[in-house]
Amino acid sequence: MSEAEARPTNFIRQIIDEDLASGKHTTVHTRFPPEPNGYLHIGHAKSICLNFGIAQDYKGQCNLRFDDTNPVKEDIEYVDSIKNDVEWLGFHWSGNVRYSSDYFDQLHAYAIELINKGLAYVDELTPEQIREYRGTLTQPGKNSPYRDRSVEENLALFEKMRTGGFEEGKACLRAKIDMASPFIVMRDPVLYRIKFAEHHQTGNKWCIYPMYDFTHCISDALEGITHSLCTLEFQDNRRLYDWVLDNITIPVHPRQYEFSRLNLEYTVMSKRKLNLLVTDKHVEGWDDPRMPTISGLRRRGYTAASIREFCKRIGVTKQDNTIEMASLESCIREDLNENAPRAMAVIDPVKLVIENYQGEGEMVTMPNHPNKPEMGSRQVPFSGEIWIDRADFREEANKQYKRLVLGKEVRLRNAYVIKAERVEKDAEGNITTIFCTYDADTLSKDPADGRKVKGVIHWVSAAHALPVEIRLYDRLFSVPNPGAADDFLSVINPESLVIKQGFAEPSLKDAVAGKAFQFEREGYFCLDSRHSTAEKPVFNRTVGLRDTWAKVGE
């Protein structure tokens, strides 16, 4: 199979193939242009994988450009986190990081060119009046009384805006297009507004800032972008994108192409709503493992490879759709099943005493991965007192229950066969200790008399156990589409985080943040980067061993 045949295919790649075949372009140059006013989420990951992936596959270039035209909402903290997320996902931008603010002088010059051509004017309507004059989807707008100012007056007023002669909201520069256009975006859109705010890149040099629609297309052209890819909500904006480039003196005219944005069940992607979750402390920050942010997914234990695989599987189309959470979870589950070393941890512990076990203990050998001998093995301490999970024992049970039952046998993982003899309870009737006997000749082998022991449970030696906090994360919302609720905060899942105190095998004291483990029979977990200490490790559940979403949907 050739390199071209091995590539994923979608309508954007078909356009690129046609452009290259026809000679319209000889190379491919894309860009990823986030606004640095928040943390990237899984939806941005789709755009990152698309833009950087195309550049990678076609041996072209992809720029990282920050659309930093609103100093009030932006911060260098977001710039740094976005760069980190792009690199963590496995991509590298072409050349230096770029900023729309790099082009403020050129953008200002192009605004003056539009004024000189009679295609832009300074408007002194209030923001409320501008909205009122704009009209509706069914009614045309009406012209501003300031629309027919002379070129000379507009130039003077625009210079007054630039030098701080107007208060915020008292004047703006608008394109002179058509107030009766069926497309509201073309009804004399604002090109520049006044903001007396310090900019994280340009300081206090400017008090006028260009709008996204004016900045974006010119930045693309100045950088030689061949294919400007954005989500479907910018479809109507393409008309303004083309209008600006058609009416200024610039040699390059990129084309904009739209694809569907990523919608994921049981979460929200709106930056405003995500910000509300953080500021109202429904979550502990932008990197909370329940958040759909890349930093939250990373802290939860998602790998870059699993997110790239997810973006590959959902594909690129023009149809908006909502992706099931199971699709995302299956990608990380497959990745970790293949690559995560195994370990034992008991999440809901109950003491088990082996009454006929002699000696202080021994070491048993366990494979780090059942199907990958190259991952080696480890020595795990075993003793006569162990912790098992409370759910792995019943005093009475039917034949379907394959774990430990009073009077019956079960195998301890990679250790011995044990038999439950009796229990001890507290005053409330809760089991505090299970007393067992063991068959000393069954260390990692079947009983000599041929009897069959079907169940296998995991365990941790009590004398060697590492106390751990285990955070069981679940979906953040209790309904598939929380954004459709009258109050999305009212459908937050109260069980989205359950904290347990358990015990783990001592090898996990060497765990590092970002490396996942399969806790045998429990799920996939990783060390929490924020709350863990050497004395008390904290592990986050990344995903369960099986798909729990099928049941949720029933």
Curated annotation (Swiss-Prot):
PROSITE patterns listed in its UniProt record: AA_TRNA_LIGASE_I
Segments of this protein annotated with the region Interaction with tRNA: 317-324
Keyword Protein transport set for record: no
Subcellular location: Cytoplasm
Enzyme Commission number, as recorded: 6.1.1.18
GO terms for cellular component: cytosol
Major localization listed first in the record, in broad terms: cytoplasm
Assembly, per entry: Monomer.
HAMAP family, per database record: Gln_tRNA_synth (MF_00126)
Family: Belongs to the class-I aminoacyl-tRNA synthetase family.
Record PANTHER family: GLUTAMATE--TRNA LIGASE, GLUTAMINE-TRNA LIGASE
Protein name stated in the entry: Glutamine--tRNA ligase
Source organism (scientific name): Escherichia coli O6:H1 (strain CFT073 / ATCC 700928 / UPEC)
